[in-house]
């Protein structure tokens, strides 16, 4: 849950920073932003769902691991959207966007890695 929360926070910040940049030519990316916000809201709702008490332990583990995987994928997508909208200034090493980019780049290899999560989920089906 803690790792999901980190990914959730990273995605939230990138989506927040991206929204005011959706103007002019960049408006062509508005649908991506809307989709990511919808995914964010859905994942947040699933993570905060109080119906877990009705599930068996394997179902709870499967759902939490799936949420962790999906939040990591969303964070990477949200940060990439922010970078596209920021343009070259996003890559300045002192920028918050650059820091989020480095954090998102680490997510697929953060233990449990994306490969490990997918493997575990495949075994739990």
Question: Could you describe each region identified by the protein language model?
Answer:
Residues 23, 41-73, 80-92:
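C-terminal helix-coil-helix/basic helical segment that borders enzyme active sites and/or dimer interfaces
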Residues 89-125:
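Glycine-rich phosphate/cofactor-binding loops in nucleotide/flavin-utilizing enzymes
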Residues 20-33, 48-61, 116-118, 122-125:
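Generic structural signal for short, solvent-exposed loop/turn connectors between secondary structure elements
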Residues 1-41:
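Glycine-rich beta->alpha junctions and the first turn(s) of the following alpha-helix
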Residues 8-16, 72, 76-79, 118:
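Predominant activation on well-ordered alpha-helical scaffold segments within soluble catalytic domains
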Residues 9, 34-41, 65, 69-76, ...:
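Generic structural signal for well-ordered, non-transmembrane alpha-helical segments
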Residues 3, 8, 33, 50, ...:
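Functionally constrained cores in energy, signaling, and assembly domains
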């Amino acid at each position: 849950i803690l790792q999901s929360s980190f990914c959730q926070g990273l995605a939230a910040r990138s989506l927040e920073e991206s929204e005011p940049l959706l103007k002019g030519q960049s408006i062509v990316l508005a649908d991506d932003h809307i989709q990511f916000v919808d995914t964010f809201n859905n994942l947040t709702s699933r993570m905060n769902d109080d119906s877990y008490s009705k599930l068996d332990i394997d179902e709870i583990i499967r759902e939490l691991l799936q949420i962790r995987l999906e939040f990591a994928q969303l964070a990477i997508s949200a940060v990439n959207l922010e970078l596209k909208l920021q343009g070259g200034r996003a890559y300045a090493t002192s920028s918050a966007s650059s820091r989020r980019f480095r954090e998102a780049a680490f997510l697929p290899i953060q233990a449990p890695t994306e490969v490990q999560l997918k493997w575990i989920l495949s075994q739990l089906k």
